[in-house]
Amino acid sequence: MDIYRIPRREVPVRILLDDGRTLDGTLFTAETGPGGRPEDVLHYLNESEEGFVPLVCGRDSFLLNKAGIVWVQLAGDPARELAGEALDARHVPARISLAGGISVVGTLAIAMPPERSRVIDFLNAAGRFLPLLGEGTVTLVQCRFVVTVRSGQGAERV
């Protein structure tokens, strides 16, 4: 019955898994999150109580273990929403090398108190996933797959 259905927002995503597969599909987030706005994918993935997330890919549906997600890439409105939250942050170009030899490049949006505004402070304070802003995209990188972070010069874009 639809009256018992929990309202959800459909968010198109591209996900890289730790086995090397890339899935294009739809994640579902709450229509109303903290502050009354729609829940964004970053906060959804950083929730600690849920270990699995549902993903719909065409006619197939998966339950993905968050621990096996290397990154989630957003485009369009969901990416603009997250990037919009970072307008007042200090933007630091970064190249993130991941386990398996993949690199992603973009901008870290650091919104921290002045005494903790270094990149290392930001990385150590991040949740399970951290946002990397790109041109028209936001890539949510799982911290446990990060090997190195350095200046954003010379990497291929995801």
Where are the model-predicted features located?
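Conserved RNA-binding domains used in RNP assembly and mRNA/RNA metabolism
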Residues: 1-158
